[in-house]
């Protein structure tokens, strides 16, 4: 379950307000009819500066209190920025990282604007090797026991297109295999758009 999110004006939005975060979490428990959540995922932290502020403030105090009381079992964080994610992993405060992993995103350097991940301009120049910050992040998570849950394994479907940043269409199995073989990766949320993509995802188990 996400922490630091609210449903407002018909939209799912990020918040950094402790009172809103607590109210939203309590409402989620009521809706689910439960008294605990396995992972409390702090939503969308994409800069080292924001992580530092959050980790030293009341939101982290609240997350730690939830964990200590058993109302969440693990603290997680979602991010698109390897530098922010690495700072979180190395802090010892998080147990789980939700991070965008695929063969194309891994070529790009850290950026606080996640829109660069799916911008054509980002792939216009030569990109030959994995970004060292991303490589360092995966290795650190493996070493520190921080499990990675992958998002955007298919790049929102972009990697399956002939206009893929890879220069040709990749298959669902190729994208899943890439993500699942990165260090520390425990699971992948495929994010399918079609029944066919869902069937291909399920078929990976027997590929």
Say what each PLM segment does:
Residues 1, 38-41, 77-78:
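Beta-strand segments within the central parallel beta-sheet cores of soluble alpha/beta enzyme folds
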Residues 2-4, 42-43, 153:
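Short loop/turn segments at strand-loop or loop-helix junctions that form parts
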Residues 3-22, 48-52, 160-169:
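Active-site mouth loops of central-metabolism enzymes
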Residues 10, 26-29, 187:
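Generic anion/oxyanion-binding catalytic loop in active/binding sites
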Residues 18-29, 62:
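Short, well-ordered amphipathic alpha-helical segments that serve as non-catalytic structural scaffolds
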Residues 19, 35, 195-196:
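Residues in well-ordered alpha-helical elements
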Residues 27-50:
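Active-site groove signature of glycoside hydrolases
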Residues 45-207:
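Beta/alpha (TIM)-barrel catalytic core signal, keyed to glycine-rich beta->alpha loops juxtaposed to Asp/Glu
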């Amino acid at each position: 379950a996400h922490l630091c999110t609210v449903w407002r004006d018909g939209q799912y939005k990020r918040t950094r307000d402790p009172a809103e975060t607590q109210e939203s979490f309590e409402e989620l428990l009521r809706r689910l009819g439960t008294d605990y959540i396995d992972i409390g995922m702090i939503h969308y932290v994409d800069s080292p500066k924001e992580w530092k502020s959050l980790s030293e403030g009341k939101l982290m105090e609240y997350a730690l209190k939830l964990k200590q009381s058993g109302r969440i079992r693990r603290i997680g964080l979602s991010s698109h920025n390897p530098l922010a994610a690495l700072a979180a992993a190395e802090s010892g405060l998080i147990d789980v990282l939700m991070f965008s992993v695929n063969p194309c995103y891994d070529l790009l350097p850290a950026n606080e604007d996640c829109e660069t991940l799916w911008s054509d301009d980002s792939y216009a120049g030569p990109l030959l090797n994995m970004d060292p910050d991303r490589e360092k992040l995966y290795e650190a998570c493996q070493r520190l026991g921080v499990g990675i849950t992958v998002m955007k394994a298919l790049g929102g479907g972009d990697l399956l297109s002939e206009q893929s940043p890879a220069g040709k269409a990749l298959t669902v199995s190729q994208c899943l295999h890439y993500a699942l073989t990165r260090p520390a990766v425990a699971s992948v949320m495929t994010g399918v758009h079609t029944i066919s993509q869902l069937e291909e995802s399920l078929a990976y188990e027997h590929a």
